[in-house]
A protein has these predicted regions:
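Positively charged, small/polar-rich N-terminal and surface patches that mediate targeting and assembly
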Residues: 1-120
Length: 120
């Protein structure tokens, strides 16, 4: 099993959830996050006004609102899920996000005690 963590643009969360659900991956965790990449934050993505004084501050970190989703899938499903995440979220512009694939030792469904892939 693998955990797939994706950091994506806020306006891409709905189409991402829909695409994953259609493919049979309806379960995921999503949360609002702030972050920045190598560009130290792209203010053009932010939909609220940022004061000119703040924009002029050299060396200040500008964190950008993003969404983080996490889902655990069987090893054989990783290429499909990653491909869908790329297809839905790639704009070709700075700020498209990142995808991380991490190993998962065990999964347990608390309600039933099911383990491994049965718990997914």
């Amino acid at each position: 099993m693998k955990e797939i963590i994706a950091i994506i643009r806020p306006n891409k969360i709905a189409p991402t959830k829909e695409a994953l659900s259609v493919l049979g991956f309806p379960g995921l965790t999503a949360c609002k996050v702030l972050g920045r990449g190598k560009q130290k934050g792209i203010l053009g993505e932010v939909t609220f006004n940022v004061s000119p004084e703040l924009q002029k501050q050299e060396g200040s970190m500008k964190y950008v609102p993003k969404r983080m989703i996490s889902l655990v899938v069987a090893d054989e499903d990783v290429p499909l899920v990653v491909a869908v995440l790329i297809k839905i979220n790639r704009t070709g512009k700075v700020g498209d996000g990142r995808i991380f694939v991490c190993p998962v030792e065990e999964a347990v469904r608390i309600r039933t005690g099911e383990r491994g892939q049965a718990a997914l």
